[in-house]
Amino acid sequence: MAALRMGKLTTMPTGLIYASISVHVAKEEESKKQLVKPEQLPIYTAPPLQSKYVEEQPGHLQMGFASIRTTTSRYIGWCKGVYVFVKNGIMDTVQFGKDAYVYLKNPPRDFLPKIGVITVSGLAGFISARKGSRFKRIAYPLGLATLGATVCYPVQSVIIAKVAGKKAYATSQQMYEAVKSLWTKNNKKLPEHKEKTKLGSADETETPAETTHNLKHSVPLPAELSSETKTKSTSGATQFMPDPKLMDHGQSHPEDIDMYSTRS
């Protein structure tokens, strides 16, 4: 028993000493890791991480709602346009009715005679085109009624004619531009290489015809003229003297030409 007690007493202090030494060593290692010299600090900052934004892909439900919205937006816009058109038409007709009621409630003195002239002219046109075609039945009454209206209301008819003429001119210009654009597009679609081949073939066909024509009408030169031309050409070749400044004399000088031998 005494031996066991002595063993325990001897082992306990050694264990405590070893634990204290290990703890002290660990603390020293941590302090060494944390401490950094100024020379060891980094000069540049760490580069940022390369991040890329990725958009979230729409799901099936979102795609379904988007397709429904795109398909219904067309019909909604069409219905809205029809509603606005009908609303404006109703408002205009109501306003026209109110103005006509106010005007007819207190009409001017020459209103009834003018209306009578217009109605009589329309009836005259209807009666005159009674036995004619359908076009005459429509055109004659309208034409005579408009003629009576222009006679009774000249200022208003002139204004209406000017406005109608401007609108007709604008529409005719638009139609002309549309037809012109279509015509230019159709002309541009024609292949250009066909035109080039046609031109090349025409030139090829024209050149041999011209050469054959010239050969047929060519006349041979007399012998004297041919000999004269030959002598002229040879004499011109012999009489040609090159410029001494441009000649390569080597180490000699052109002034000392008399001192050189001409033996071959």
Swiss-Prot record:
Biased composition (Low complexity) is annotated at 223-238
**Mitochondrial intermembrane side of membrane:** 28-110, 156-264
Q: Give the disulfide map.
A: none
Q: Which Gene Ontology cellular component terms are annotated?
A: MICOS complex
Transit peptide location on this chain? 1-27
Source organism's superkingdom?
Eukaryota
Subcellular location(s): the record lists: Mitochondrion inner membrane; Mitochondrion
GO BP annotations of the record are:
cristae formation
Topology of the protein relative to the lipid bilayer: Multi-pass membrane protein
Per its UniProt record, what Pfam families does this chain match?
Answer: ApoO
- Those parts of the protein on the Mitochondrial matrix side are 130-137
Bias (Basic and acidic residues) ranges:
189-198, 245-256
Q: Which UniProt keywords apply?
A: Membrane, Mitochondrion, Mitochondrion inner membrane, Transit peptide, Transmembrane, Transmembrane helix
Residues covered by region (Disordered): 189-264
Chief subcellular location equals mitochondrion
Give the transmembrane ranges: 111-129, 138-155
Q: How is the subunit organization of this protein annotated in UniProt?
A: Component of the mitochondrial contact site and cristae organizing system (MICOS) complex, composed of at least MICOS10/MIC10, CHCHD3/MIC19, CHCHD6/MIC25, APOOL/MIC27, IMMT/MIC60, APOO/MIC23/MIC26 and QIL1/MIC13. This complex was also known under the names MINOS or MitOS complex. The MICOS complex associates with mitochondrial outer membrane proteins SAMM50, MTX1 and MTX2 (together described as components of the mitochondrial outer membrane sorting assembly machinery (SAM) complex) and DNAJC11, mitochondrial inner membrane protein TMEM11 and with HSPA9.
What does this chain do? Component of the MICOS complex, a large protein complex of the mitochondrial inner membrane that plays crucial roles in the maintenance of crista junctions, inner membrane architecture, and formation of contact sites to the outer membrane. Specifically binds to cardiolipin (in vitro) but not to the precursor lipid phosphatidylglycerol. Plays a crucial role in crista junction formation and mitochondrial function.
UniProt family annotation: Belongs to the apolipoprotein O/MICOS complex subunit Mic27 family.
The name under which this protein is listed is MICOS complex subunit MIC27
Task: Give me the gene this protein comes from.
Answer: APOL
